[in-house]
Each structure stands twice: as structure tokens, then as C-alpha cells.
Design a protein with these regions (language model features):
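Short, basic/glycine-rich phosphate-binding loops at helix/coil junctions
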Residues: 17-20, 101-115
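Short active-site segment of divalent metal-dependent hydrolases/proteases
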Residues: 13, 152-153
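Generic beta-sheet signal
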Residues: 5, 142-148
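Glycine-rich phosphate-binding loop signature in dinucleotide/nucleotide-binding domains
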Residues: 45-48, 135-142
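Acidic, His/Gly-rich catalytic cores of divalent-metal-dependent hydrolytic chemistry
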Residues: 191-208
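Loop-to-helix element that buttresses phosphate recognition and phosphoryl-transfer chemistry
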Residues: 5-63, 67, 115-129
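Domain-level recognition of soluble alpha/beta enzyme cores
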Residues: 163-189
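Phosphate-coordination/substrate-recognition cap region in phosphate-metabolizing enzymes
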Residues: 38-103, 166
């Protein structure tokens, strides 16, 4: 039986709407985010997940609890968003103004980029690689759900596709579903990306 993992991004927050960088700040879902969480929960209600992991940040954990519908949810720090250090809580336009040189390196996709007092791009990717390896080795043959953040889920796509550059990755919208599968010790394969068909009536936001 193949190992399957379903990643779901958390629902919308006010920071997503206002283009404020969250990173590992613990921002809550807004009203629309809660509604999105209910919709993705309805979408996944019949899926027999063997284990459910979530980032321990509340916007992801609440989304996971909606999907779990009473089943156990395991909060793990490894699923947190990129730690952006001093940039966390700032508007993107403020970052572009105050950190113009650092932004150039960020946009280049270099693994050497490190936000002030934050986590380097290389360490962020390594965190995703280790988590995906752990799933394959410790939960082989299981059906796994992971609720996380847009930046982290994009890192898992890089792991699966063997990419190194951080930028130029497709959007992962609020409560989007992304799936991977692996047979035994084989490589992960992408099954679907950014499936938001349950959100037909919603406006979309893509912030970190």
C-alpha cells in the first residue's frame, strides 16, 4: 500500500488580507478563514486518515481540528511557517522599503538568504526534507494529513521535485489541498497541487 500525504494550508487570517508577513507569529483565523476551514473539513470528511499532524500555530491547528472532527491531532513545530525574524508582523511594503538589499537576495531564491534574526532559506528547506523523510520511514503505508502553511507546503514541493531555488513556485492558497504519494522506498510523487474546488464562492489570498 502506498504512503499518501495530504497537505492542507490553514484558513485565511487578517494578515493574509492586509499583506502583513506572519511567519511564525501566532495569528488567528478570521471569520472567512473559519468558514474556509469548515468547507475543507466537509470536503475531506470521508477520507480515512490514519494520522493527523498540524503546525502548532493556532491558524493551522484550528483548521486541523475542524477537519479532524474529534479525531486526535498531533501538533508539531516542524510544520511551522518560515521564521522571518524581524520581518514578522511587518507589511510587505514596509519590508520592501526598509530592507531593499535583503529583498534582492530573497527574490533571487538563494539558499543563503536569511531574514534578520530569522531562519535561512537553506535551513527551512532542510526542515521540510527531514519531515518528508520522517513520514516515509515512520509511517510507510499510512494515509497522512498535515495542516501547515503556504511557505512550508511549497518547500515540500521543492523536496518532491528536487528543486533548490525558493522563488517561482506556484501559489498555495488558503485551505488548498496538495497531495503526494510514495510506494515503499520509492520517491514521492506529486498527485495534485492547490486544489481549492471547495472554495468556489470565496475571494483568494496568498500571503505568508
Amino acid at each position: 500500500m502506498p504512503t499518501t500525504v495530504c497537505f492542507v494550508r490553514h484558513g485565511e487570517t487578517d494578515a493574509n488580507v492586509t499583506d502583513r508577513l506572519q511567519g511564525q507569529s501566532d495569528t488567528p483565523l478570521n471569520a472567512q478563514g473559519l468558514a474556509q476551514a469548515e468547507l475543507v473539513a466537509a470536503r475531506l470528511k470521508d477520507e480515512p486518515f490514519d494520522i493527523i499532524f498540524s503546525s502548532d500555530l493556532s491558524r493551522a491547528l484550528v483548521t486541523a481540528e475542524k477537519i479532524a472532527a474529534g479525531r486526535p491531532v498531533i501538533p508539531v513545530k516542524e510544520l511551522r511557517e518560515w521564521h522571518f525574524g524581524r520581518w514578522q508582523g511587518m507589511l510587505w511594503k514596509e519590508i520592501l522599503c526598509d530592507y531593499s538589499e535583503e529583498i534582492l537576495l530573497f527574490k533571487s531564491g538563494s539558499p543563503d538568504f536569511e531574514p534578520p534574526e530569522g531562519e535561512s532559506a537553506g535551513r527551512f528547506l532542510e526542515r521540510a526534507e527531514k519531515f518528508m523523510d520522517m513520514l516515509k520511514s515512520e509511517y510507510a503505508g499510512k494515509r497522512i494529513l498535515c495542516v501547515s502553511h503556504g511557505g512550508f507546503i511549497k518547500q515540500t514541493l521543492k523536496v518532491v521535485l528536487g528543486l533548490r531555488s525558493f522563488r517561482r513556485l506556484p501559489a498555495c492558497e488558503n485551505t488548498a489541498i496538495c497531495r503526494y504519494a510514495a510506494k515503499e522506498e520509492d520517491f514521492w510523487q506529486l498527485v495534485c497541487w492547490n486544489d481549492t474546488s471547495h472554495l468556489k464562492s470565496f475571494n483568494r489570498s496568498t500571503g505568508w
